[in-house]
Amino acid sequence: MLFRSADISGSVAAFARFTLMLVYAIQGQFSKVRSFVFIDGIDEVTDFFRGEEDIANAIHRVNTEADVVWVDGHSDYGHAFEVFWEKYGKDVGPKTTVLLLGDARNNYHASQAWVIKEIRQKARHVYWLNPEPKSYWNTGDSIVGDYGTHTDGVFRSEEHTSEL
């Protein structure tokens, strides 16, 4: 099973569009994919993509129907990950691969990196794709290193979203 969770906040708007297109493509190829989006809240959007022939409709539903704002709509990875763990952690198992997508810019909120550690202990693999250049990682409010220590790898996504 593949769990995919993507930041769709303003700081990664172009990347978010790319990741939603990726979700659409992956869900069309595999039967056991669950997709989540977050800002400071998190929501499962698997059904938004399932059986949808028009990716624009699926993305529109994510943008208008997904419950991803908890307080103020500024990224809070820690809170989103805690809610994920509370609601869906029981579904992560030894056959699960988790793909996390985002810049890890947390607006100086608590990282709650323990959640990623717990997920990694239960899952087969955990990977992180970050759209920012590596030179930006762990600068300012970026806490990708806090999370990365609990993954099987953090990679810069070689995005070309302007071409999409």
Tell where the protein language model's regions lie, with residue ranges.
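Von Willebrand factor type A / integrin I
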Residues: 117-162
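Short beta-strand-loop
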Residues: 38-63
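Exposed acidic/Ser/Thr-rich ligand/metal-binding surfaces
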Residues: 78-125
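MIDAS-like acidic motif and immediate structural context at the N-terminus
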Residues: 3-20
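Von Willebrand factor
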Residues: 56-96, 133, 138-139
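Short beta-alpha junction loops
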Residues: 39-43, 104, 130-136
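Short, small-residue-biased leader/transition segments that mark boundaries at the very start
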Residues: 1-2, 160-164
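Structural beta-sheet core signal
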Residues: 4, 35-37, 98-100, 128
